[in-house]
UniProtKB/Swiss-Prot annotation:
Alphabetical list of NCBIfam families matching this protein: PRK05416.1
Pfam families membership: PapZ_C, RapZ-like_N
Protein name as it appears in the record: RNase adapter protein RapZ
Name of the gene encoding the protein in the UniProt record: rapZ
Protein residues bound to ATP: 8-15
Record Gene3D superfamilies: P-loop containing nucleotide triphosphate hydrolases (3.40.50.300)
Keyword Phosphoprotein applies: no
Region (RNA-binding): 266-284
Length: 284
């Protein structure tokens, strides 16, 4: 059974995540005091029910040791996973402005900007031990819920899920990436007027990139690097490995290479997911 602990800065989407987990059959509790985690887990263990609990700045323990003690006292039947949601500062400010809600730390007479910054410091102990960090800055409510459904329902127990994610550097580097590879030096289909409207998922773009030796060399050396360290990553008790591939716009080169790497590791029996940030953003 899974005990999913959902945390993150206020406004990053914890309530949305909890509702999505409830739809997936998790028993969900919002803002449960950390010290009660073992009691909740023992109660649910007999019923064979996976649980999801949100922890935010309002119910953070006074010291990280209290959280560690609670985790150590969980029944063996539960496999704890920590999901940390985040968004960039400007996005959080905009979301609070849109909803006109008060920040949990506003009672300390802090400005919204100062409250967001202080909350980040207070939640750092949880962020640092998270199994999965998700940047929701560019996600809608529905995209966040769908992403969680895809990642959690697609994950096999005790198996590392490899996520290959394409992005454009001009849109920013994904904060949930474990590895970032820059492919802006590779031949660019953008300069071919016929290929410019297409994406790295289209066959003519794939054929263009496939003709270049440096593209093959990059893919080979990148997958060799990942294969070298994958056994150690798999034994490091982590649930996800996110590999981000970036080009200028996130439309051609990064998409093609992310798909090539995903197909390679999928063909070798790995649990693989692929995501294309720029292409997904264009659909909305």
């Amino acid at each position: 059974m899974v005990l999913m602990i959902v945390s993150g800065r206020s406004g990053s989407g914890k309530s949305v995540a909890l509702r999505a987990l409830e739809d997936m059959g998790f028993y969900c509790v919002d803002n449960l005091p950390v010290v009660l985690l073992p009691d909740l887990a023992r109660t649910l263990a007999d019923r064979q029910i996976s649980a999801a609990v949100s922890i935010d700045v309002r119910n953070m323990p006074e010291s990280p040791e209290i959280f560690e003690q609670a985790m150590n006292n969980l029944p063996d039947a539960f496999s704890p996973q920590l999901l940390f949601l985040d968004a960039d500062r400007n996005t959080l400010i905009r979301r609070y402005s849109d909803t006109r809600r008060l920040h949990p730390l506003s009672s300390k007479n802090l400005s919204l900007e100062s409250a967001i910054d202080q909350e980040s410091d207070l939640l750092e102990p949880l962020r640092s031990r998270a199994d999965l960090i998700v940047d929701t800055s560019e996600m809608s409510v529905h995209e966040l819920a769908e992403m969680l459904r895809t990642r959690l329902l697609g994950k096999r127990e005790r198996e590392l899920t490899m996520v290959f994610e394409s992005f454009g550097f001009k849109h920013g580097i994904p904060i949930d990436a474990d590895y970032v590879f820059d492919v802006r030096f590779l031949p660019n289909p953008h300069w071919d007027p016929k290929l410019r409207p297409m994406t790295g998922l289209d066959k003519p773009v794939a054929a263009f990139l496939d003709r270049h030796t440096e593209v093959h060399n990059f893919i080979y050396q990148t997958r060799s690097y990942l294969e070298l360290w994958l056994p150690m990553l798999e034994t490091n008790n982590r649930s996800y490995l996110t590999v981000a591939i970036g080009c200028t716009g996130g439309k051609h080169r990064s998409v093609y290479i992310a798909e090539q790497l995903a197909d390679y590791f999928r063909s070798r029996g790995k649990n693989v997911q692929s995501r294309h940030r720029t292409l997904e953003k264009r659909k909305t």
